[in-house]
Curated annotation (Swiss-Prot):
Miscellaneous comment text of the record: This species is an endoparasitoid, that contain symbiotic polydnaviruses (PDV) in its genome. PDVs, used to overcome the host defenses, are introduced into the body of the host larva at oviposition by the female wasp and have been shown to be essential for successful parasitism and development of the parasitoid inside the host. Interestingly, the coding region for Vn4.6 is located in the opposite direction upstream of a gene coding for a C.rubecula PDV structural protein (Crp32).
Function: Endoparasitoid venom protein that interferes with the activation of host hemolymph prophenoloxidase. May act in conjunction with other venom proteins (such as Vn50), by competitive binding to the zymogen and thereby interrupting the enzyme.
Highest taxon above the source species: Eukaryota
Protein name as catalogued: Venom protein Vn4.6
Tissue expression profile of the protein: Expressed by the venom gland.
Source species: Cotesia rubecula
Record-annotated membrane-spanning stretches: none
Signal peptide location: 1-23
One Gene Ontology term, aspect cellular component: extracellular region
Length: 65
């Protein structure tokens, strides 16, 4: 019985970790510290006139591939 409870707890814990990390992608940011420090960076987006429209966290791993 305790092994089943432990297994359920570990599955839920792993799920929370992955959901929390993925939730930062496309989140608004002011600088790189607002994003996940190892896999994301704060990207600046511009409107059609070239003016800064905002900043969002982007996946840095995609830049390496």
């Amino acid at each position: 019985m305790s092994k089943i409870i432990l297994a359920i707890f570990l599955i839920v814990l792993c799920g929370l970790i992955f959901v929390t990390v993925d939730a930062m992608i496309d989140a608004p940011c002011k600088d790189n510290d607002d994003c996940d420090r190892f896999t994301e960076y704060c990207a600046i987006y511009a409107d059609e006139n070239g003016n800064e429209a905002g900043k969002r966290c982007e996946d840095a791993i995609g830049l390496l591939v």
